[in-house]
Amino acid sequence: MSIDGENDVVALKRVGAVVAEARDTMASHVAPGVTTAELDAVGREVLRRHGARSAPQLAYRFPGVTCISVNDELAHGIPSQRVLRAGDLVNIDVSAELDGYWADSGASFPVGDVSPRARALLFSTRAALSDAIAEVRAGAPLRNIGRAVERRAKRTGFRVVRNLCGHGVGRHIHEEPQVPNTFDCNNPVLLHEGLVLTIEPFFTTSATRAVESDDGWTLRTPDGSIGAQFEHTMIVTCGAPIIIT
């Protein structure tokens, strides 16, 4: 969506704050022995308390309130009785609707002590999000976002998942434009003031694409390599973007 006045900004900040609270509250419960269903219940309670609705349930009838993906699962993991174990990486992706406005955010977290390689993956993916956000301003080419993400991956020895990307958001969970995590010199799209979008780099230790699991939802690496994702929703301005999550 594109902002059409201050009321839009206020409403987006409101739903963004709820999404961020759910994400962070769920993260505070990440520990060995916790199930992904238990984490999902934490997120459900935060959304319920604020009168927000789960975006994946509302838009796609997803079988969970939030998406929780572990290790080689990259996105859309279904909350279940799976028990988190020390050394795992868990991704928490929360998106919600409140009063007709939508926001989306995700982050990956270590479960207990993780390997140095896994910790480096988390650091690099989080840094890629920061690098990409620094490219966001009205009039800038959309392709600069993917260039920043790819450069971070190359510098740190990780791989970009090429078939997962960010997206427009605001009046629905997935809107135009797509926001690729790779550089395409032929992409003519320019960012404009008031555009609402997400940026969400996905890095892995070796895979460059995600494949669908037999459950019809979960996207994972085809080679079993671990992945990480970080995501924010933001509003494009003539200066630094407004991060609402």
Task: Please place each PLM-identified region on the residue numbering.
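Active-site neighborhoods and metal-handling regions in enzymes and metal-associated proteins
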Residues: 1-245
